[in-house]
């Protein structure tokens, strides 16, 4: 698929977007995290629900088989990615869907909910980020912003398979650096990625969150819950950053997803 242009790929025309299109039935758009799709894939969910769910899994520009990008990511990349996603769905003729976002993808899904609620049957926000400040992750971001080759070999293989041997390091570095930038530009501990707008969300929201997520700051999810008092919050006790793909808890994650994917 080619977009005439995308705010997530400034200066590039046209913009090539690769989208996996699997299954049939209820449209569900899965929005991957900041390192791309194949590190945390939804293979088990496709297998479990593919006979009743039409999964659309786009690679954002800069990722996977979509348009290659260079240079630093802008601080408002989540909003830009939300706009790109809607442009893609317009081109595909998808008017309304469940948006399931993981990590950075969950931020993007929430921003779609704010800007285009009529397009959203539900938001499923997994491994959600609320704060731009991540002091407990700063050393993680600093390490891999400079030394991506220090990642585990398995992770490197998955990244290379997704983005290519020449590109995967750049993907990791761009994402780590923009999170460091977000933290540096935040002036108050009360800052959030949504500029105080989450309470204005008018679509059904379900959080899926691993209790042991290392990218979550103390009190961060509680702040998100307070901002969205009516949201459905599901903690997975054994979960870390990607409950849907973790061996210990993907089944529990599927039970939750099945509430929204079965019989719709």
Describe each model-derived feature in a short phrase:
Residues 43, 194, 203, 217-226:
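Short alpha-helix in the alpha/beta-hydrolase fold that links the catalytic acid
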Residues 177-197:
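Active-site nucleophile elbow and catalytic-triad environment of alpha/beta-hydrolase enzymes
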Residues 57-97:
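Active-site loop/oxyanion-hole signature of alpha/beta-hydrolase fold enzymes
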